[in-house]
Amino acid sequence: MARVKRAVNAHKKRRVVLERASGYRGQRSRLYRKAKEQLLHSFNYNFRDRKARKGDFRKLWIQRINAAVRAEGITYNRFIQGLRLAGIELDRRALAEIAVSDPNTFKTIVDAAKAALPEDVNAPVEA
């Protein structure tokens, strides 16, 4: 049976793993087995957190919008309801950006949402 010489492939495989783990602390950046294990965990964290990032940004946009509309004397919930009734279709990302970068435009949007709201808070809403 012929001899299989795999030293080059094995060294390359180990070198790639250790290069990818170069920023890790302690043995995780120096020992192949520890580095490989940490890389597998890192890939899982990366996948999970790419999904979580979307929710984190949505929470951030809602907080920014809430702070801006409370300065105008309305709650976030009533503001979103007013936007829907006024037929204004801006997503939370755009609203948060407008609230931060252009307060005058945001104030006009808030005024339009306020105008679309019914006077009585408990009145049935027809959308």
Swiss-Prot record:
Q: Does the keyword rRNA-binding apply?
A: yes
Query: Which CDD domains has this protein been placed in?
Result: Ribosomal_L20 (cd07026)
Q: Name one GO cellular component term.
A: ribosome
rRNA-binding as UniProt keyword? yes
Q: By its UniProt entry, which Pfam families does this protein fall under?
A: Ribosomal_L20
Q: Which GO terms describe its biological process?
A: ribosomal large subunit assembly; translation
- Matching HAMAP family: Ribosomal_bL20
- Would you identify the family this protein belongs to, as annotated? Belongs to the bacterial ribosomal protein bL20 family.
What is the name of the protein in this document? Large ribosomal subunit protein bL20
